[in-house]
Amino acid sequence: MTRIDAHGLKIAPVLFDFITKEAAPKTGIDPDAFWAGVAAILRDLGSKNRELLKFRDTLQDKIDAWHLANKGKAFDLGAYTAFLKEIGYLLPEPATQKVETANVDDEIGKICGPQLVVPLTNARYALNAANARWGSLYDAFYGTDAIPHDPSEGGKGYNKARGDKVIAKAKAFLDAAAPLATGSHTDVTAYSVIAGQLSAKLKSGNATALKNAGQFAGYQGSAEAPSVILLANNGLHVEVVIDRSHVIGKDDPAGVSDMILEAAVSTILDMEDSVAAVDAEDKVLVYRNTLGLMNGTLSADFEKGGKTLTRALNSDRSYTTPSGGTLALHGRSLLLIRNCGHHMFTDAVLGADGEEIPEGILDAAVTGLLAIHDLKGHSKVKNSRTGSIYIVKPKMHGPDEVALTVELFARVEKMLGLPENTMKVGIMDEERRTTVNLKACIQQASKRIVFINTGFLDRTGDEIHTSMEAGPMIRKNEMKAQPWIKAYEDWNVDMGLIDGLPGHAQIGKGMWAAPDKMADMLAQKIGHPSAGATTAWVPSPTAATLHALHYHQVNVKARQDELTKGGPRAKLGDILTIPVSNSNWAPDDVRQEIDNNCQGILGYVVRWIDQGVGCSKVPDIHDVGLMEDRATLRISSQHLANWLHHGVVSKDQVMDSLKRMAVVVDKQNAGDPLYQPMAPSFDGVAFKAACDLVFEGRTQPNGYTEYILTARRREAKASETAKA
């Protein structure tokens, strides 16, 4: 490939052309000036980026040495804490300073609800997520195990017996979220609007109204026979759809054919953990899809029922208000964009030294450029209505790394002529050093922060790697019951409340990873809003619709007030308690643990390496589909690396399991025409990558999987090109 030279940079032609011909036009930014700005930022911040990465390694070496020096001794939390302070890992907690982030959209500062995460490599998935702001409750109940499936309800077409259960459950939700003054929504035979109030005629012939008249937010159609009733509860909206000609509405006493819930309030468009973007072509695909979302042109064709359908961004929704005015509601999820972390490098651009440049610097510059299309109103639909660009920054270790991000964003703003603090930052609290210094991290970004979020899987991966020399870790499935996990989750909310995030920023919780287990999600994920979180991650638009029910059940703002009055709950000592085990596991337990980890690693890695799929529903060892990305890979590979290092398992045991599980994964993927089996040769690039992740896991910086995955994916792509 012949690269294009610009201001000392050597740029891949596909990226150069994208910036020149697609991204820059209509922004007012000259492409040459853009590259001059990127080059200047790299000159000033590139070395600082590398110094911070070296400091990570220095701290890890010192922590390893401390554990080795104290091997065989009882763990002394006091001595350990003092040591972490001495080496600069644990910093003094700063005085409380409330955040000052301004110009945030309501989806960030006011509305509590679900958050989707979607790979930017897949246009249709990205559009589905952006459009998941509104979702059918009837469909979500009918199509999932949220209502248990009865074998008698099988067959093609609409099953009325199951439909009746769905309607009953949905009406029960409505009775709880927007109750009538008398009676139940089940008893309503007609809704109408009279003198600006919602009137509900009951089977008895009497009319009633809402218990709280203020919950009636608007309607569509005529006042006498509205086609949609809009209700509000805890900041979220519900549409009651009325259509007596519909297959469901014709049998409903009130003609109700569906309930549409405000669901995915926000969505993270991911350039990081859920994508496999290893070269300039991949990066341009990610950037091009981002551009299409920012300027409103993105569309995707797909086949359904023998027809080709086109998906595009939904329009806003319009209603008549109770007073006769017009109400417009956002028709799409507010979009945040997750850039790569400081530790990633890309060959899409080479620096003056011929080396790959920090990928996060390129991401920030390009994201800012692309978002100008939204800020300038080039799309028929707006993302931010307050003039902000929302960027989630992952895998930062401590406040100095947050400070680098803040400086980077300031430089990009200056380069692009954007007002100061236009580029907002979401801080992923997924690394141990960020957790223990979270207050200082927040304060470094006090005028930009719009998001803090816990991520159990990555955070556990860093927990294992940081304390690799402390001893063998407990079994993976026992990790969630450990004291450090609860303390970590509570600490995040505590710090968010202390620093005044409500009204300025989201406080988020992690992913529900089992998209087919919606009954379990309904039972368990209510814990996230109950913990004071304003948002939490879900794996699909359907899951977003169902998780929205929790925000109708829990008034998060009231819960946050309760927590604030109660004071901080988490203790630093619990967070620093290392989850090592003294157990002498039975051979069957060890084999089960190895097999579980190996199967999960192979099931994810084989698609990443061979097909470039960075996030997908991967069957686990029991054939339960789980959403996998690099975070799940990190914990599994680090856990095996830890057990190998401490002699709990041998290399031969792990290799035997990898080969047996490769056969299992091959069978699970037998229906995929693009799949390349790993057995019986076990010499493919994907299998080798899985082996590298385990057997080299202890020496990978912070236990990250990206370096091995990227190298092996590039190898696989080169092999494909050679064959072609």
Swiss-Prot record:
Q: What is this protein called?
A: Malate synthase G
Q: How does it assemble?
A: Monomer.
Query: What cofactor(s) does the depicted protein rely on?
Result: Mg(2+)
Q: Where does glyoxylate bind?
A: R338, E430, G455, F456, L457, D458
Q: Name one GO biological process term.
A: tricarboxylic acid cycle
Keywords attached to this Swiss-Prot or TrEMBL record, sorted alphabetically, are: Cytoplasm, Glyoxylate bypass, Magnesium, Metal-binding, Oxidation, Transferase, Tricarboxylic acid cycle
Keyword check for Repeat, yes or no. Answer: no
Q: Name one GO cellular component term.
A: cytosol
The catalytic activity of this protein is classed by the Enzyme Commission as 2.3.3.9
